[in-house]
Regions:
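C-terminal accessory region of SF2 helicases/translocases
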Residues: 168-172, 180-276
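Inter-lobe coupling/hinge segments of SF2-like helicase ATPases
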Residues: 1-189, 249, 276
Length: 276
């Protein structure tokens, strides 16, 4: 191949492109040597006190932990946990252990210092936003608590969970949630059920839709009004195989006019489906 694209959890549009044959797919479905699956629990926020008590026990045993929040500041419009609210409360409750706050407003120099201290074990609890979603590797961190987990996307939840379980110790991810919509309940159900990034990506595609395969939308309902890329995958594979066989066997003077007719027909069908 001319290009290799690597991802832990492909976005819906990228996964859909593999189905249409624009990308070949290879799946690494094994954990690196010595790693174990992260134990995941989805817990309603009215049990927050018991979760915080359990977190204190883990810190008492020498562990390190992340507490991730969807927002930095409290909002009167959005009913979700924030670093300035619940995050500061958590730090006071667990003041026995050194903790720090990390988010996008923290100066770059301070962010680097905080991460170095966390990696060295000097900071035991890191209260953060999704700034820790990628590029953070602290094998000794074995616990992650995600506040207002219903506010995060499925792939994002999986990426966050990947910050723990990077050493040989058993690791845990607890997703605290508020009131759930039907879609949020589906997301968290899949998240609790699977540690498989490809399964997560397939569920994300099913829930959010593939977006615009010929445009820029990375998720959402496709322009096509009949077939469903998830439930009708068999027909997609069959039609692609038939088209490939047809193209490979086109010979002679009649090939070019045939291709031109097919192109005109395809353009017309697409314009009708797109409402044009």
């Amino acid at each position: 191949p001319d290009m290799l694209v690597m991802t832990a959890t492909p976005i819906p549009r990228s996964l859909a492109l593999t189905a249409y044959g624009d990308l070949s797919l290879s799946v690494i479905d094994e954990l690196p040597p010595g790693r174990r699956e992260v134990v995941t629990r989805v817990v309603p926020q009215d049990r927050r006190d018991s979760v915080y008590g359990w977190l204190a026990e883990r810190l008492e045993k020498g562990g390190q932990a992340y507490a991730v929040f969807p927002m930095i500041d409290e909002s009167s419009e959005l009913r979700c946990a924030s670093i300035s609210g619940q995050g500061e409360t958590l730090r006071r409750l667990l003041s026995k252990w050194p903790s720090e706050i990390l988010h996008g407003r923290v100066e770059a120099e301070d962010r680097e210092r905080i991460m170095e201290s966390f990696a060295a074990g000097e900071i035991r609890l890191l209260v953060a936003t999704t700034i820790v979603e990628v590029g953070v590797d602290v094998p000794e961190a074995t616990v992650m608590v995600i506040e207002s987990a219903e506010r995060f996307g499925l792939a994002q939840l999986h990426q966050l969970r990947g910050r723990v379980g990077r050493g040989g110790e058993r690791s845990y991810c607890v997703a605290l949630h508020g009131q759930l919509t039907e879609e949020a309940e589906r997301r968290l159900g899949v998240f609790a059920e699977s540690n498989d990034g490809f399964r997560i990506a397939e569920a994300d595609l099913e829930i959010r839709g593939p977006g615009d395969l010929l445009g820029k939308r990375q998720a959402g309902e496709p322009l096509f009004r009949v077939a469903n890329i998830v439930t009708d995958r068999m027909w997609l594979d069959r039609s692609r195989a038939d088209a490939k066989e047809l193209l490979e066997n086109l010979e002679g003077e009649g090939a070019q006019p045939f291709m031109q007719r097919m192109e005109r027909k395809a353009r017309g069908q697409y314009q009708r489906l797109a409402g044009g």
